[in-house]
Amino acid sequence: VTITVDANQAQSTTNWQPGVHWDYARALQTARELEALAVVWLEEPLPRYASEDIARLNDAVSIPTAGGENNVGLHEITRKVRENVYDVPEPESMVKAGITTLRKIGTLAQAFWKKCVPQQGGGDIGGGAHLHLVASWSNAPFMELLNDPPIGDYRHKFSIFANPPEVSEGMMSVLTSPGQGVEINPDMIESDS
């Protein structure tokens, strides 16, 4: 079983979850505890613009740090990769100016010998596009797909597809229809109009 931990400290520049704000000392202590548990990585241990502290954390621990889903544009992720702020960039095409920019981020990460694990792409069509990118990258071991049933079941995000992807034993097949592989369910369009 692969376990990753998301501290969710990069969502905004303010404390959006009262009582859950991490400082450097808390991030360091937690990272050391997670190392002992063989957790694969610690995602977003500090606010997204605390680059110096995240890089310092990377130097102090062996557990990789991941993040970047809320950083905007290629320029922000380029800086994070160059300065070793995140070991595993986790771009999100809905924030990063689309699939073309996401593709560039994956190539950049590969050039720096880093894994790249995109976020879920907002589900629906973005999720299908992310799935194709992950399948084409040798440095993408998997793609993050939110699944929090019953309300946040990943299948809800793909309900507009005539051919929704299914997760089976932790794997999801790439959609095979032309383009991004997505076929929109015409009944969904008619029911929403």
Please place each PLM-identified region on the residue numbering:
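Metal-dependent enolase-superfamily TIM-barrel catalytic cores that perform enediolate-based chemistry
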Residues: 1-55, 60-61
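Short acidic, gly/pro-rich beta-turn/loop elements at beta-sheet edges
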Residues: 15, 101, 184
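Shared catalytic-loop signature of beta/alpha-barrel
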Residues: 38, 47-67, 71-171, 175
